[in-house]
């Protein structure tokens, strides 16, 4: 049985309104005010600081070999602390090599976002390069099959670009610790992630926020699914492809994916508003649509999360009883572990603090 407990969560308190969209003005950092709300989630797994530090060390050495080892990049890795996130989200994994492969994928995906998307979000509204660049990034893990001369040209382009090379090499490590079916699963999920990135960029170019239902539909794609879907590979087993593809299992995976991504929205709410002209997170979207203050929208976002996680509890129970299989039980437990670790990491990481 899954134990859902209430986690007291600080609510950002809105300061005097300064933005063009209600609910997107400056706010005090979460934790400053006295108001809290409750998020329901399993309790966090134990910390493994020594393992996390070793994963981070290996990832930094790898980055330096790619030409991504500048002082700011290395500092960013230690602030992001992917090793801690992986050990929290995959408490069943004891294999540092497997967890390091996941750490490299996280850093590579973050590099794509930072280099191709976050930078562009600060450029002029006529910049249309994100879509083509994301397609290029996907080809680094899903190689084109070209004529020999063109293939050589593409290979050189990929290897000369540190972000594309990071994608390619990180995915190569992932292929070594997973089955072909597991690797293809993640390859597909990353393409879906880039579709979500591109949609978000479209809203930014329009300088508008989507309605809540459309935002959440996009968040289903612009999500942590590529990371969450490594749960069996990192634990050293494989959920059979036909079982993974079963509608009941896909339903559980999709629900867990959206919930995990909302932790990012909630924990990074204040930072996003501070750093971006147009914040793109669930509280901001709710505030704009319902014309309410950010703190009220934050509480409403937590209520949506709680509805979703209770529905996931029912869905995983139904899948486990309808498809009785030891590997599936292990996989569903892994989804819940990922949520517990992700919630804890997001609300305690230095990445989301000022």
Curated annotation (Swiss-Prot):
Record region (Disordered): 1-29
InterPro entries: Isoprenoid_synthase_dom_sf (IPR008949), MIB_synthase (IPR047945), Terpene_cyclase-like_2 (IPR034686)
Record bears the keyword Cell inner membrane: no
Reaction catalysis annotation: (E)-2-methylgeranyl diphosphate + H2O = 2-methylisoborneol + diphosphate
EC number(s) stated in the UniProt entry for this protein: 4.2.3.118
Binding sites annotated in the UniProt record for Mg(2+): 113-114, 118, 264, 268, 272
Major enzyme class: lyase
GO molecular function: metal ion binding; terpene synthase activity
Keywords: Lyase, Magnesium, Metal-binding
GO BP field: terpene metabolic process
Record-linked Pfam families: Terpene_syn_C_2
Cofactor names: Mg(2+)
Family per record: Belongs to the terpene synthase family. 2-methylisoborneol synthase subfamily.
Additional remarks: 2-MIB is a volatile organic compound that has an unusually low odor threshold. Together with geosmin, methylisoborneol is responsible for the characteristic smell of moist soil as well as unpleasant taste and odor episodes associated with public water supplies and contamination of various foodstuffs, including fish, wine, and beer.
Function recorded in the entry: Catalyzes the cyclization of 2-methylgeranyl diphosphate (2-MeGPP) to 2-methylisoborneol (2-MIB), which likely involves the intermediacy of 2-methyllinalyl diphosphate.
Name of the featured protein: 2-methylisoborneol synthase
Organism name: Saccharopolyspora erythraea (strain ATCC 11635 / DSM 40517 / JCM 4748 / NBRC 13426 / NCIMB 8594 / NRRL 2338)
């Amino acid at each position: 049985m899954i134990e859902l407990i209430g986690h007291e969560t600080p609510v950002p308190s809105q300061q005097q309104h300064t933005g063009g969209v209600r609910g997107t003005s400056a706010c005090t950092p979460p934790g400053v005010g006295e108001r809290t709300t409750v998020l329901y989630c399993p309790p966090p797994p134990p910390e493994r600081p020594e393992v996390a530090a070793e994963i981070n060390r290996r990832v930094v050495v790898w980055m330096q070999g790619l030409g991504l080892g500048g002082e700011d990049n290395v500092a960013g890795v230690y602030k992001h602390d992917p090793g801690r996130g992986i050990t929290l989200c995959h408490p069943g994994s004891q294999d540092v090599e497997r967890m390091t492969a996941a750490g490299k994928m996280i850093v590579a995906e973050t590099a794509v976002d930072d280099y191709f998307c976050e930078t562009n979000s600060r450029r002029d509204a006529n910049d249309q390069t994100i879509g083509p660049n994301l397609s290029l990034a996907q080809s680094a893990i899903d190689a084109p099959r070209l004529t020999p001369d063109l293939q050589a040209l593409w290979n050189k382009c990929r290897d000369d670009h540190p972000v594309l090379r990071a994608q390619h090499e990180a995915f190569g490590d992932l292929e070594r610790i997973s089955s072909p079916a597991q690797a293809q699963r993640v390859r597909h999920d990353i393409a879906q992630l880039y579709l979500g990135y591109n949609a978000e960029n479209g809203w930014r170019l329009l300088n508008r926020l989507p309605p809540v239902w459309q935002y959440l539909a996009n968040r289903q794609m612009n999500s942590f699914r590529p990371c969450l879907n490594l749960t069996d590979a990192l634990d050293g087993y494989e959920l059979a492809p036909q079982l993974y593809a079963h509608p009941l299992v896909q339903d559980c995976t999709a629900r867990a994916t959206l919930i995990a991504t909302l932790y990012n929205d909630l924990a990074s709410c204040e930072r996003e508003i501070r750093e971006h002209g147009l914040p793109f997170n669930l509280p901001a979207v709710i505030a704009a649509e319902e014309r309410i203050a950010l703190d009220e929208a934050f509480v409403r976002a937590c209520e949506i999360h709680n509805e979703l996680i209770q529905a996931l509890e029912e869905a995983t129970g139904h899948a486990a009883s309808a498809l009785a299989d030891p590997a599936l039980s292990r996989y569903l437990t892994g989804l819940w572990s990922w949520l517990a670790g992700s919630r804890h990491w997001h609300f305690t990481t230095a990445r989301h603090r000022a």
